[in-house]
From Swiss-Prot:
This is Snaclec agglucetin subunit alpha-2. InterPro entries: C-type_lectin-like, C-type_lectin-like/link_sf, C-type_lectin/snaclec_domain, C-type_lectin_CS, CTDL_fold. It comes from the Eukaryota. Its main location: secreted. Residues 34-153 form the C-type lectin domain.
Length: 158
């Protein structure tokens, strides 16, 4: 009997400790949750600037998606694959080449630096998109005026 109570208590402790790893927030209807953020694929094609503006209008802290890890990359690729028609070749991310003080640097539209890189090809174009030919797992730089669907991301509000 004592062993049963001990094991039951241990399982309860494990369950409670795991319950705070991402399941303690809710995203709005139509949004998907991953690692403390909410994501949504927007199918209506827009140029990069209009897509970023749209994302910032959806929620506080909203931006085009930044991808900070392989796990997040896989999540976003699956989300895009499930929601984008087969005719779409590219999907905007928040990746943008900035020309600051005559030095090119790449950063995300939310202001974070690029800590995880997964570029397929680096062209002299300024805006980053996911590439269909790679299952939306790799990024390519495109001209920012091109019209593409996109992914928005925001931290949920408490």
């Amino acid at each position: 009997m004592g062993r049963f109570i001990f094991v039951s208590f241990g399982l309860l402790v494990v369950f409670l400790s795991l319950s705070g790893t991402g399941a303690d927030f809710n995203c709005p209807p139509g949004w998907s949750a991953y690692d403390q953020y909410c994501y949504q694929v927007i199918k209506e094609p827009k140029n990069w600037d209009d897509a970023e503006r749209f994302c910032t209008e959806q929620a506080d802290g909203g931006h085009l998606v930044s991808i900070e890890s392989k796990g997040e990359r896989d999540f976003v690729a699956q989300l895009v694959s499930q929601n984008i028609e087969s005719v779409e070749d590219h999907v905007w991310t928040g990746l943008r080449v900035q020309n600051k003080e005559k030095q090119c640097s790449t950063e995300w539209s939310d202001g974070s630096s690029v800590s995880y890189e997964n570029l397929l090809e680096l062209y002299m174009r300024k805006c980053g998109a996911l590439e269909r030919e790679t299952g939306f797992h790799k990024w390519i730089n495109l001209g920012c005026i091109q019209l593409n669907p996109f992914v928005c991301k925001f931290p949920p509000q408490c």
